[in-house]
Swiss-Prot record:
It is found in: Cytoplasm. The gene is grpE. It comes from Enterococcus faecalis (strain ATCC 700802 / V583). Participates actively in the response to hyperosmotic and heat shock by preventing the aggregation of stress-denatured proteins, in association with DnaK and GrpE. It is the nucleotide exchange factor for DnaK and may function as a thermosensor. Unfolded proteins bind initially to DnaJ; upon interaction with the DnaJ-bound protein, DnaK hydrolyzes its bound ATP, resulting in the formation of a stable complex. GrpE releases ADP from DnaK; ATP binding to DnaK triggers the release of the substrate protein, thus completing the reaction cycle. This is Protein GrpE. Belongs to the GrpE family. Gene3D superfamilies: 3.90.20.20, Head domain of nucleotide exchange factor GrpE.
Amino acid sequence: MSKKEEKQEELQEEMEAVDAAGVSEVEVEATEIENLKAELSEMEDKFLRARAEIANMSNRNKNERELLVRYRSQDLGKKILPSIDNLERAMAIEVSDEQGESLKKGISMVLESITVALKEEGIEEIPAMGETFDPNLHQAVQTVPASEETPADTIVEVLQKGYKLQDRVLRPSMVIVAQ
């Protein structure tokens, strides 16, 4: 073989080697690209899930804040109710002199101002007298026989007023019910 033929053969072998290496290099790069695409897809999925979780947390916090604002006077209302009961008991006392009447008038004014303040905060008395008994709003402490005037499950007497804040019962009405 001549030198020229040897050189051509050598070049041919090198080209075949380069072609083989190039093909395997392209295959490696294609595999790498697929792996990177899969990883990117996984990261996008994680990102979307994290974003959704943050949105859910934000909504949950917003709802909790709204509930806190809506029911902020619940504890205060529960603490004031015994004082209202005492003022109402004081109003029930019979007085015979002018000084007693004056004192009773002052108590009435205080009771009225507290009642107005509670209404402004959303705290209201639960209607009970003559109403149909509702175990969600009333607590029956005694029963009496029903009559023609008072049908069964009717409240005949209120022993202690009940109060509610918006749709929550702060204290049920303690009542006597006809059975």
